[in-house]
Amino acid sequence: MSKISTLQELYVDELKDLWSSNDQMVQALSKITPHATHSKLVSMLETSKKGIAKHTELLKTLIEAQGEKVKKEHCKGMEGLVAEAIKHTIAEAPEKGAVLDAAIIAQYQRMTHYGITGFGTVSAFAKALQLHTDHQQLGAAVKDMYQSDELMTELAESAVNTEAV
């Protein structure tokens, strides 16, 4: 892409970046989920992958609505988070058990917080650009992510972390 000079161009560039981010997170979760031992955690990770796929379809729709070629732009930020997630949940992680589940939740939340930040930013851009429907849809995606994050926190605090002690 050429040099960005307008908020509109930045908006589309960020949408494409988020698409890549989502794809990378789903790939990471697909590798991590089989290592989770708490049944509720496994279920939550599977549900999350479906939610991320839904948000990815939204991103594609929003990119297309801007008259842009529907393609993603590789997100190096998520690439780093995914590398850390794999390291801490597979490569250098306990084989199984509550400590591993706690690590999985921690890494999931790091990646999710990146998504919350990115989607929140593009939602604000959409508002400034008076793309009201985009703003509303992106805001709903942020709410979904917050809810997922809160559910992971509840699981960690009510079960996994105490089991890991």
PLM regions: where:
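Amphipathic alpha-helical hairpins
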Residues: M1-V165
